[in-house]
Amino acid sequence: MPKGKKAKGKKVAPAPAVVKKQEAKKVVNPLFEKRPKNFGIGQDIQPKRDLTRFVKWPRYIRLQRQRAILYKRLKVPPAINQFTQALDRQTATQLLKLAHKYRPETKQEKKQRLLARAEKKAAGKGDVPTKRPPVLRAGVNTVTTLVENKKAQLVVIAHDVDPIELVVFLPALCRKMGVPYCIIKGKARLGRLVHRKTCTTVAFTQVNSEDKGALAKLVEAIRTNYNDRYDEIRRHWGGNVLGPKSVARIAKLEKAKAKELATKLG
């Protein structure tokens, strides 16, 4: 190898130059002027925003919202808090399906029945008194009497009764008398069963022989969820949940305290 000559290694091929795409220049029409909006005070008309928070709602909406927030903020005693533990959807659907079979008759149905009976009597076929069919019994006073006499097989209470004092004693009474009870969502759902707008509570007294198995299954599930868990339920207080502002304020104070402590310890 001759002196002064360096050994030549293999040359790496240079990276291919990235071919830049030539962007076509946007042709700006000079007739279209830019007029940016200024949303400062007293300037342009403001854009459409969601102003739900600032709407003056009707009184009944305000009250129900305030009630919901109070139930979260204040400490709710167990007797009232138990009404938040409603029956699960699947069991509730089965229960309502069964209850639908035992709806009481409407005014029109009663009128037609009595009319048919009167026509029979007028035709001289004799008036045979019919046996009363098993139906749901509704209303606080009726259900309370049935529970006290141990005639109710199952009691269904609405979770949103207002005022709650109307039914607050019922779970304790049912447990004392050994009657299975459950809390279901919606007084309107119970109301539909008995042809009213709303209903506080309904009770099963008797069912037909073909539905006894279905009722027994429901009673077993309900007893496990409510009657047997009564001691546990009456220990649970509700509410006492702070709002986002209070949580943020407390967090800020805690942060400041921690910072101060850190500087002291150095």
Curated annotation (Swiss-Prot):
Record-listed cross-link Glycyl lysine isopeptide (Lys-Gly) (interchain with G-Cter in SUMO2), residues: K11, K20, K21, K48, K97, K125, K245
PROSITE patterns on file: RIBOSOMAL_L7AE (PS01082)
GO biological processes: cytoplasmic translation; maturation of LSU-rRNA; translation
Residues with N6-acetyllysine modification: K34, K97, K217
Keywords: Acetylation, Chromosomal rearrangement, Cytoplasm, Isopeptide bond, Ribonucleoprotein, Ribosomal protein, Ubl conjugation
Signal sequence region: none
Keyword Ribonucleoprotein among UniProt keywords: yes
Key word Lyase present: no
GO CC, any one term: synapse
Subcellular location: Cytoplasm
Molecular functions per Gene Ontology: cadherin binding; RNA binding; structural constituent of ribosome
Main subcellular location of this protein, as a coarse class: cytoplasm
Disease: Chromosomal recombination involving RPL7A activates the receptor kinase domain of the TRK oncogene.
PANTHER family linked: RIBOSOMAL PROTEIN L7AE FAMILY MEMBER (PTHR23105)
Record's subunit section: Component of the large ribosomal subunit. Interacts with CRY1. Interacts with DICER1, AGO2, TARBP2, MOV10 and EIF6; they form a large RNA-induced silencing complex (RISC).
Similarity comment: family membership: Belongs to the eukaryotic ribosomal protein eL8 family.
Name of protein: Large ribosomal subunit protein eL8
The organism's taxonomic lineage, starting at the top: Eukaryota, Metazoa, Chordata, Craniata, Vertebrata
